[in-house]
Amino acid sequence: MAGARPGVHALQLEPPTVVETLRRGSKFIKWDEEASSRNLVTLRVDPNGFFLYWTGPNMEVDTLDISSIRDTRTGRYARLPKDPKIREVLGFGGPDTRLEEKLMTVVAGPDPVNTTFLNFMAVQDDTVKVWSEELFKLAMNILAQNASRNTFLRKAYTKLKLQVNQDGRIPVKNILKMFSADKKRVETALESCGLNFNRSESIRPDEFPLEIFERFLNKLCLRPDIDKILLEIGAKGKPYLTLEQLMDFINQKQRDPRLNEVLYPPLRSSQARLLIEKYETNKQFLERDQMSMEGFSRYLGGEENGILPLEALDLSMDMTQPLSAYFINSSHNTYLTAGQLAGPSSVEMYRQALLWGCRCVELDVWKGRPPEEEPFITHGFTMTTEVPLRDVLEAIAEAAFKTSPYPVILSFENHVDSAKQQAKMAEYCRSIFGDALLIDPLDKYPLSAGIPLPSPQDLMGRILVKNKKRHRPSTGVPDSSVRKRPLEQSNSALSESSAATEPSSPQLGSPSSDSCPGLSNGEEVGLEKTSLEPQKSLGEESLSREPNVPMPDRDREDEEEDEEEEETTDPKKPTTDEGTASSEVNATEEMSTLVNYVEPVKFKSFEAARKRNKCFEMSSFVETKAMEQLTKSPMEFVEYNKQQLSRIYPKGTRVDSSNYMPQLFWNVGCQLVALNFQTLDLPMQLNAGVFEYNGRSGYLLKPEFMRRPDKSFDPFTEVIVDGIVANALRVKVISGQFLSDKKVGIYVEVDMFGLPVDTRRKYRTRTSQGNSFNPVWDEEPFDFPKVVLPTLASLRIAAFEEGGKFVGHRILPVSAIRSGYHYVCLRNEANQPLCLPALLIYTEASDYIPDDHQDYAEALINPIKHVSLMDQRAKQLAALIGESEAQASTETYQETPCQQPGSQLPSNPTPNPLDASPRWPPGPTTSSTSSSLSSPGQRDDLIASILSEVTPTPLEELRSHKAMVKLRSRQDRDLRELHKKHQRKAVALTRRLLDGLAQARAEGKCRPSPSALGKATNSEDVKEEEEAKQYREFQNRQVQSLLELREAQADVETKRKLEHLRQAHQRLKEVVLDTHTTQFKRLKELNEREKKELQKILDRKRNNSISEAKTREKHKKEVELTEINRRHITESVNSIRRLEEAQKQRHERLVAGQQQVLQQLEEEEPKLLAQLTQECQEQRERLPQEIRRCLLGETAEGLGDGPLVACASNGHAPGSGGHLSSADSESQEENTQL
C-alpha cells in the first residue's frame, strides 16, 4: 500500500525447489481415524512442486494440491491416533518411545474454517522433519502462489499425467472432468489431436506430451482475441511478428511509462531475441527472428509478463519505522468458526489466522470452574463452545512465526475476576512463550511521553500483550485485589445501583445474564475502577448519571466508564454496537507486568491524547464509534494514528460474523482493523488481498502523508495533494479462459477501493452467452482518470456466473499495476490461486495530468515535435495574414487558455443536466483561511459554483424519444398497409376500365372520327354523331367510376392521417409531462446533494481554521476557537439560506421553461392539423384531372405527367408508384414533425 525503499529492489524471493527426498519418495503409513483405515503408501512430490501424491489401496493415484496446504505439523503438534486398533498397528504402547517424532499431519483446505487433516507416520527415522519442512516451504512459496499463466497450465497438465489408472494410462474421463463445461468440445479437440476421445478409453502418457497438451488447449479454447492483438501490433494478416515489431510492442505497450529509463532501460534487440528463443518452438520462425501466434500467446502468459512486478510481492517496504506507521493484519474473536451467537470455538482458528498472516489475535478469557479452575476462552453469554486458554497459547506459540517473523499482538479481553487464575494466565504466557514474550520495554524505547514505538524490525520474533494495566497506586492497598468496587465506594449518583457480580461461567441462563443483555465481543468494555486505580487517569470522567436511568443501563454505563471506546453523551443510548455483556475486570500485578507497548486506555478525545503524547497507549473503537470520529474529525484521526495505535472491531449486532469495509479505516491510518476471519465476504477478501503483499508479513507501511508529522492529510480530499503523485488507470477486460465447470454465461466486475474520491463501484461487462470456456468481451475500457492516493488504492477484478455465483477474483495494488496486456490468474475467496480460471486484460497506468496541463506535458515529453508544430503553424498563418500578424495571433492563442480558463469549458447541451455532477472551483473549497468566504462576492461565487443550472428538455429532443419513435414506426406501418390495400383495388378497377375502352374501340361501335370529335358540320351524318356521343358518355362513366373509388380512398387516408397526428400529439404530451416529473424528482435530489456539498465545504473550512488556531498560544486559541464556531454557525445559516433562495429561483425558471414547452406543444397542434387537412384537400382536388389523363390521355395546362398517366402509357398499374407513394411520404413528413 505504500512505496518501497528508493532505488532498485534486490529481489529476495526464490522459486520453489523440490529436494531429492521428496521427488524420490518415502514410505509412510497413512491412517484415517474416521474411516479406521491405515495403508502403506509412498509419498512423492512432482519435480515442479505442484502436487503431493500417493497410490491408494485401489491402485489409483491420489493427489493433493500443494497450494491448498495450510500447515504441516510433527511431533506433539501432530494428531495422535485415538482408535485402539490404529494405535496398536502403529506401535503405540510398545517399546518404541519415539513414535510421536515419526508422525506428520498435513492441514489443507480452501479456507481457514473448512480444513482437512491428512495423517501420516514415517516408516524410517529422520524422514518426517525433512518432509514437513520442505512441504511447508513449497506451500508457502510466494512465487508459486503468484505463478504465471503458463505455469498454471503446466500444473493442470501435471495433474493429468499423475492421475493414471492401474495400467499407467491417462483416463479420458479425467480430461473430461477437468474441462467439464463443454464435453463435446473436449472430445472434438482430442480427436483433432489424434487422441482417444471416448470416455471409457485412456491415453498412453508418451502420446500426450506437453506439446500435444498445448495443441489440445489451442483447439479447445480458440483465441480470436490474440489474433486481434497481433493485427493491432502490425502483423497485417501474417502469422508472425518480426523482431522489431516485438521489441516495439514490449517497449510501447508493455512498458510502464513511469519507470526511470536509467534504472529500468527499454528492451534491446538482443533481449527480444532471447524472448523469441524462449517462447517460439517453430524452427523456421526462430531462424528468421520471428515469433508465431502460438509463441506470442506463450509470451503473454510467461513469467516476464506478470500484471505486478515481483518487488510488490517481496518484502520490499521499510520495516524500521514505529509500529504506528503500519497497517497490521488483525483478527476479531479469533476463536469463532461461525456466527457470534452459536457454533463451535476452535483452537485451530488461532493457528490458521496466524498462518494466514494475522499479527493481532483476540482472546476473550473467562474464569474457569472448580475443581480445575482453568481459564478458558469463549464468547460470553452466548451458546458458543469453550476452548482452554492453555491450548490456545500453545497453538499461538507453535504458529506465531511460521509465516512471518514480525511481532504478534495478543489482544486480551480479560473477564477473569480471580487473582489466582490471573496469576495462572500470566504464568502460562511466561512459560509457553518463553523468551518470545516481551515483558520489559526495550532500552531504546522506554515507556515515556514523546518516545515513539519500536519498529517491527526491533520486535522481530516477539509477542506483545494488550491487556488492561494496573498502575501502582500511592496508597498501601494490596495489589492482588481484583474485587469489584463496593457499593458504598460508588458515586452518590449511583447509590441506587446494585453491584452485580460477574458470573464465573458466561452461559445463557445464568442468573446474572439477565441483567447484562447483549454480546461480549470485547474491546476493553466495562473496565471496572477500583480504589487501586489512580484518580487522574486518561479517560476518567464524572460518574454522575441521571437518577431516573433504569437499573441495568446505569450499571452497564458505570461498568463502561473505563472502556476504550469514546463515551456517548446520551446516558440512555443502548450499547448494542459495542455488544457489551459483562465488564472486563482489572488486571492483577502479574498480568499488568506483561503489558508494555500496547496499553489500552479509554479514548476521551484526540486533543487529550495529543497532550499526553504517550505513544504506547492505544484505544479501541467499535466500528460505529470509529465512523463517528472519521466523519467528524478525519484529519485529527489521521494525526492520532501517526503516533498511537487504534483498533477497530465489528459492532455487536453483526451476529452473523459479517464484516465492515476495512478501507474506511485504513483511509485514516487505523492500524489494527480487526475482522472476522471466518467470514469470507468482500471486506475479508479485500483484507486478504491487500495483506498478500510485502512478503505476506502482516505489516504494510502506510503512505508517507499518513506518517510524517510535518504533513497534514484530509482523507476526504477531492483535489490533488501537493507532494503526492496521482495516477490514472484504464482497464479493458478482453477475454476469459476456463472460468467455470458449467456451460453458463460469465460477466466481470472491476472495482476500485481507496479514498472516497478514488473508490469506484461497479464497472461491469456484459454477460457472455452460455460460454465459460473462452468468452470474449473486448468492450470499451473502464476509466479511473484520477486516483488521488494510489498507494492506498486497490483494484479488484472479479468474475461471476450469470446467476451471481462467485467464480474468482484478484486484488491488485494500484500503485504497482503494470501497463499492457496481461493475464490475471484468479483466486478463491480465501485468496488461494485457482488453476485454470484466468482473464486477459489490457491496462494503461500512468501519472495523472490535469486537462489544462496536457499540452505542457506533451511538450515536455517531445519538445522537438512541439517546437516543430509551433513553427509549422506560424508559417501557415504567415502565408495568409503576414508574418508579424501571425506571430501576434500565435501569442494570443497561447495566452488565451491562461487568461480565460473558463472559456475553454464546453457548453453542456445535455437534455438532462440533473445527471451531471456540479463543478467545484478549486479556490473556495480548498482555502483554509478564516476570511475566504467573508466578502459577499466570494460567497455568491461559492453558491454559483455549487448550483447547477437545470433547463427543460426542448421539444425537438423529446420528438426523438423512444416512445415517439416507436409510435411513428407503428403509424408508418399502418399507412403503408392501407396504401397497399387501396392500390390493389385501384389497379384492378383501372385495368378493367382500360380493357373496356380498348374493347369498344376494337369492335368499332363507338370509334371516333375527326368529324365526330369536333363540332358536327355535316347534318346529314347523324349516325356518326350519335356514336361519338355514346363514346363520350361511356368515357365519362369510366372516369366517374374510378374517381368515386379514389375519392373514397382519399377520404379514408385523410381521416387516418388526422387520427395519427392527434395520437402523436397526445403521446408527445405524455412524454413531456413524464420528463417534467422526472426533472422535478432529480431536482429535489440535486437540491439535497448541493446542500450537503455546501455544508461539507463549510465544515472543511471550519476544521482547517481550527487546525490553524491550535498552533497558536493557548489564551489566543480559546478566543479564536469561540469566534470560529460563532462565525461558522452564522456563515452556515446565511449560505444555506442563499442556496435555498437560488434553488427556489432555479425551480421557478424550470417551471416557466416547462410551461413554455407545453404552450408550444398546444399551439402547434391546430397548425399541424390545418396544414395536413389542406394538403389532403389539394390532393383530392387533383384526382379528376389525373384520372382523365390516365384513362383518356388528356393533358391540361400546368398539369405535368402524373403517375396515373405514366401507369397508363407504360401499361403499369395506376398508383403503383405515384400518387399513393407520394401520399405515403407526405404522411411520414407530417409524423416526423411530431
UniProtKB/Swiss-Prot annotation:
Phosphoserine PTM sites in chain numbering: S474, S490, S495, S537, S927, S1105
Chain positions found as N-acetylalanine: A2
Keyword Zinc-finger: no
Signal peptide feature range: none
Requisite cofactors: Ca(2+)
Polar residues: bias regions: 579-588, 888-907, 1222-1234
Pfam families named in the record: C2, PH_14, PI-PLC-X, PI-PLC-Y, PLC-beta_C, PLCB1-4-like_EFh
Annotated EC: 3.1.4.11
Regulation of this protein's activity per its record: Activated by G(q)/G(11) G alpha proteins in response to ligand-binding to G protein-coupled receptors.
Catalytic activity: a 1,2-diacyl-sn-glycero-3-phospho-(1D-myo-inositol-4,5-bisphosphate) + H2O = 1D-myo-inositol 1,4,5-trisphosphate + a 1,2-diacyl-sn-glycerol + H(+); a 1,2-diacyl-sn-glycero-3-phospho-(1D-myo-inositol) + H2O = 1D-myo-inositol 1-phosphate + a 1,2-diacyl-sn-glycerol + H(+)
Domain PI-PLC Y-box: 591-707
GO cellular component, one term: protein-containing complex
Sequence ranges assigned to domain C2 in this UniProt record: 708-836
Family matches, as InterPro entries: C2_dom (IPR000008), C2_domain_sf (IPR035892), EF-hand-dom_pair (IPR011992), PI-PLC_fam (IPR001192), PLC-beta (IPR016280), PLC-beta_C (IPR014815), PLC-beta_C_sf (IPR042531), PLC-beta_PH (IPR037862)
Principal place of residence: cytoplasm
Function noted in UniProt: Catalyzes the production of the second messenger molecules diacylglycerol (DAG) and inositol 1,4,5-trisphosphate (IP3). Key transducer of G protein-coupled receptor signaling: activated by G(q)/G(11) G alpha proteins downstream of G protein-coupled receptors activation. In neutrophils, participates in a phospholipase C-activating N-formyl peptide-activated GPCR (G protein-coupled receptor) signaling pathway by promoting RASGRP4 activation by DAG, to promote neutrophil functional responses.
Binding partners and assembly: Interacts with SHANK2. Interacts with LPAR2.
Protein name: 1-phosphatidylinositol 4,5-bisphosphate phosphodiesterase beta-3
Organism: Mus musculus (Mouse)
